[in-house]
Amino acid sequence: MRCLISLVLGLLALEVALAQNLEEQVFNSVQSMFQKASPIEGTECIICQTNEECAQNAMCCPGSCGRTRKTPVNIGVPKAGFCPWNLLQTISSTGPCPMKIECSSDRECSGNMKCCNVDCVMTCTPPVPVITLQ
């Protein structure tokens, strides 16, 4: 009987710990969608309690001076597929790369192209499709 009670209490404590961790993860992912305040923005805190109090597409979010109005930033979602494997990526080159950087994220590439490291530079590349095993 003691073992059963200990097990139940242990599971309850684990559930509480996981719930708190999940809440922190959700908060961190929401927080990362907003730009860091610039020195000018940092001096002006527009306090709010709910999103309805905010103009246009701004949202009420936790900040350094309480809940304040912030404008979300489009962080983009990675496109489907993977970057092709490139043997030259694993070999360190000597000297500067002669090619120009074309992109820094998938959203800068047209269509379904992905921003991948090819040779020594980031460039828009056709993706390798995701293969699902059944």
Curated annotation (Swiss-Prot):
Residues 1-19 form the signal peptide. The keyword ATP-binding does not apply. Its main location: secreted. It is found in: Secreted. GO terms for cellular component: extracellular region. No phosphate or carbohydrate binding could be detected; however, both cholesterol and triglyceride are associated with the mouse protein. The keyword Signal applies. One of its GO terms (molecular function) is nutrient reservoir activity. Residues 27-73, 76-128 form the WAP domain. InterPro entries: Elafin-like_sf, WAP_dom. Disulfide bonds join C45-C65, C48-C60, C83-C116, C97-C120, C103-C115, C109-C124. SMART domains: WAP (SM00217). Keywords: Disulfide bond, Milk protein, Protease inhibitor, Repeat, Secreted, Signal. Milk-specific; major protein component of milk whey. Transmembrane segments: none annotated. Could be a protease inhibitor. May play an important role in mammary gland development and tissue remodeling. This is Whey acidic protein. It comes from Mus musculus (Mouse).
